Amino acid sequence: MTDLISPKLGEKCFDPACGTFGFMISAYQHAIDGVDLYSLSDQEMAAFQDSFYGVELVHDAHRLALMNAYLHNVPAHISCEDSLAPSAKRLKGFDVILTNPPFGTKKGGERTSRDDISFQTFNKQLNFLQVIYRSLKADGSARCAVVLPDNVLFADGDGTSVRRELMDFCNLHTILRLPTGIFYAQGVKTNVLFFTRGKTEKDNTKEVWFYDLRTNMPSFGKTAPLKEEHFIDFVKAYTAEDRHAVDDERWSVFTREQIGEKGDTLDLGLIRDDSVLDYNDLPDPADSAEVAAANLEEAVDLLMSVVKELRALEVQD
């Protein structure tokens, strides 16, 4: 995610659910790669010192984030608070956001209390998604990669409204369908959404590309971890100069109009699952019934012949 978003030196980076600050440490390491920090001007160093922000709600995780940033020499700004609370509204104007919001409903089942998002819902991921795209700088280049569960792609009601606003505010250009159980609990299906904030708040998404890294893939877990090599084909497709020229069955595209015709669902781009029975490939039911009846008749005839032989043996005795 970090390599594809590619944070640059001096860009302000943010993780609104930072955990132990892993994404921001990765962003820091990517940004300084090949850079001599001692050669920076005072202005460049000041911008660099103000580049890496995070918010974490859990106190223990917040302390670990501070320690992790210190150990990696990251000039971090990490607050212990709720990104969905009004106090976090000050955190805006970022160039890069990398994050994996927590899974589940809002604590206590209440709606978010932020009044700077359009749709206050009980769905934590939908609230985080709104906070994320509204926290990006509206300059046409601020960008994000966020891990979200499948329900964000197809939830109706406010879910549909949030997706429409996302595609209006941002160019939602790519969705990576991840294997099951990679993030969150085993069995939870997740995705990575890649988007760039537009300069306006209307019609920024023209088409959305999907890469299916889920269907017909091996089972991943502790004994068979997902590795960088599994993403090679996706990265080739993502970075291709002409995405339409990529020859990969897992790579597909839907225009904004096609998505609208499907009710603005983003639960798209999955290829045929070879493990699932396709009922269209089954023979005609009437033909199957005739074959079954013929087999039964043959079996009955065979049984009757056995009965006759047994009766004959009884007579001989």
Please report, for each region that a protein language model flagged, where it lies by residue.
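Conserved S-adenosyl-L-methionine
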Residues: 2-99, 104-106, 115, 122, ...
